[in-house]
Amino acid sequence: MNQLVDPKVVIALDYQDKQQALHFISQLDPKHCRLKVGKEMFTHFGPEFVKQLVAKEFDVFLDLKFHDIPNTVASAVKVAADLGVWMVNVHASGGRRMMEAAKKILEPYGTNAPLLIAVTVLTSMDQSDLQELGIELSPAEQVKRLAKLAKLSGLDGVVCSAHEAQELKTLLGAEFKLITPGIRPMGSDAGDQRRIMTPKQAIDAGSDYLVIGRPITRATNPVEVLKNINDSLV
């Protein structure tokens, strides 16, 4: 597999056993993918695990979706930056002041600052879920509303469904990064993600980075699956 200038695939790690996780990671080349550490693994293994991945030269997306008062979120984002992560996220529904505080605290890091990304509408949520929260907008409308707020707050991009990507690129510009979960290679089970696309469809729609978990982590030959995905994006 040739070295990729900007790997598009972010592998979502979902292991409860640290040694299993490290064995899986040992098969990967950081030139060909990035890694996502979410709440479950971070709670299991802590920041030292993230440091291990960074030391192996992987770009790490720390997916903890911070949502709290501005000062608390800013402090947490600073700690993430000190871990050396490539990307960190916050909930856009925390509001503009929270997002602005998180962005401001990263200023001293300059070009070494992680990408600061907002979560809009979780891909498992549909219209009925939003209505139960008192939101009468469609998922797509709510995504646009929160994505615009994130850009106004100075953030680098948003997590969004591939189905919103094309419109968001047009609305918010090419430099505003779109990170897309709910990606399944052809023939994969949809799992718990309601709004899904294949990797090529998502990139063609405007997504910049693709979060893919079980189709790679649970594959018999994960390196081959990753290679096939990367090849499909060339």
From Swiss-Prot:
Quaternary structure note: Homodimer.
Binding site for substrate: 14, 36, 63-72, 123, 184, 193, 213-214
Stated role: Catalyzes the decarboxylation of orotidine 5'-monophosphate (OMP) to uridine 5'-monophosphate (UMP).
NCBIfam families in the cross-refs: PRK00230.1, pyrF
Record organism: Psychromonas ingrahamii (strain DSM 17664 / CCUG 51855 / 37)
Listed PANTHER family: OROTIDINE 5'-PHOSPHATE DECARBOXYLASE
Protein name according to UniProt: Orotidine 5'-phosphate decarboxylase
Top-level taxon: Bacteria
